[in-house]
Regions:
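Mature N-terminal, pre-catalytic/accessory segment of carbohydrate-active enzymes
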Residues: 1-49
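Short amphipathic alpha-helical segments that mediate assembly, nucleic-acid/protein binding
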Residues: 6-10, 31, 44, 163, ...
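Intrinsically disordered, low-complexity segments enriched in polar/charged residues with Gly/Pro
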Residues: 9-12, 93, 279, 302-304
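Aromatic-lined, polymer-binding surfaces characteristic
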Residues: 23, 38, 44-50, 55-291
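Carbohydrate-active enzyme catalytic cores, enriched for enzymes
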Residues: 209, 249-346
Length: 346
């Protein structure tokens, strides 16, 4: 029989979608239960530990944080731009992990010290857009991601000026990405940067602000229906045909979007047959303690299943009730019980 996968329309989803905040990382209606449930959770503790480290390390301006030693030696403008993007991404990605930890630490405790450090840090980061050292679409999408998380997570504590700062950045950066996607993305087989990161980030920005800025209604319609019609994979067999190293970069999108859509709609987006097929790809492409199977560029760097891959398999085991993914995780954790903690990232 042909598997049935028929998600609800966006109109039905939005009819039940809450107007309060937070509503993206968690629903405010479940907030106290989530805090209680995670009181002794080691993953929750990891976020709080990372957030505390941020508080003890004040952030400087980008020009003081970035290493331009190699950049200034290059005379070719293309090489300089590439090196600048690479070096600035190191700082911006680090700060995404920091801000995300601060937002989550606040949501897990309601301790306002995490909000204060988070908004101060993010205000500085957003000012980097005027710096000559800031470049690249990944960096810009990361600012959108941080602004969205802070807006939704800290909403009840934000001053009017802070809300406006975040909304202005969400509107401007979000519109930039939306206008790059529309009539382009849906007509291509794949667009790696979009599928890896920026599409997920725009989706969360849309649902964080829908009903509050007019642009978000358009983004929400586009992102929800694009996912249903095109994603998660390029083929139904569950394989990641554009390379295993590229698969790793897509892991957050492949879990976070369907998990979010499932929560707000009541429909199981992991029921898409692609996910159970993909569990087999994860296992066969890189068995426990094995190198990657050699598919695609940069596969040589995948020397053993890392924390991100094992964490992804763990999510599939839970969301799809997949015994093969569960066995894969169990086998690896027998030898490396801390493997999931190594997946800690923004």
């Amino acid at each position: 029989d042909t598997p049935e996968f028929n998600p609800p329309t966006l109109e039905k989803v939005l009819a039940e979608y809450p107007s309060h905040h937070p509503r993206v990382l968690l629903d405010a209606a479940d907030w106290e239960k989530i805090i209680a449930k995670n009181k002794n959770n080691s993953e929750a503790r990891a976020y709080m530990d990372k957030a505390s480290q941020c508080i003890s390390r004040p952030l400087k301006h980008l020009q003081e944080e970035i290493d331009t030693t190699n950049v200034v030696t290059l005379t070719n403008i293309v090489q300089r731009e590439s090196a600048l993007i690479r070096e600035s991404r190191k700082i911006v990605d680090r700060e995404e992990a920091n801000v995300e930890a601060l937002v989550r630490a606040y949501l897990l405790t309601k301790d306002e010290k995490y909000y204060r450090e988070g908004i101060n840090r993010l205000s500085e980061i957003l000012s980097w857009q005027k710096s000559k050292y800031f470049a690249g679409d990944f960096n810009l999408s990361t600012l959108l991601s941080m602004s969205t998380s802070a807006y939704d997570g800290f909403y009840n504590l934000l001053s009017p000026e802070e809300k406006q700062l975040l909304l202005d950045n969400i509107r401007r950066i979000g519109d930039k990405f939306y206008n790059e996607y529309v009539n382009h993305l849906e007509n291509r087989i794949a667009d790696n940067h979009v599928w890896q990161m920026t599409f997920r980030i725009l989706t969360m920005a849309a649902f964080a602000t829908v009903g509050e800025i007019s642009e978000a209604s358009v983004w929400t319609d586009y992102c929800y229906n694009e996912w249903i019609s095109r994603l998660p994979g390029l083929h139904k067999d569950g394989g990641w045909h554009n390379g295993d190293a590229y698969f790793h970069v897509n892991i957050r999108t492949l879990i976070e979007i369907p998990a979010f859509f499932s929560r707000i709609s009541g429909f199981n987006f992991f029921a898409d047959p692609w996910y159970n097929n993909n569990a087999l790809y994860v296992i066969y492409q890189q068995p426990p303690f094995s190198k990657s199977g050699g598919h695609g560029n940069s596969h040589e760097g995948q020397r053993s299943p890392n924390g991100g891959r094992v964490g992804y398999a763990d999510a599939l085991a839970r969301e799809c009730n997949n015994p093969w993914a569960a066995a894969y995780v169990h086998e690896i954790m027998q030898e490396d019980p801390d493997i999931l903690s190594k997946a800690f990232e923004a």
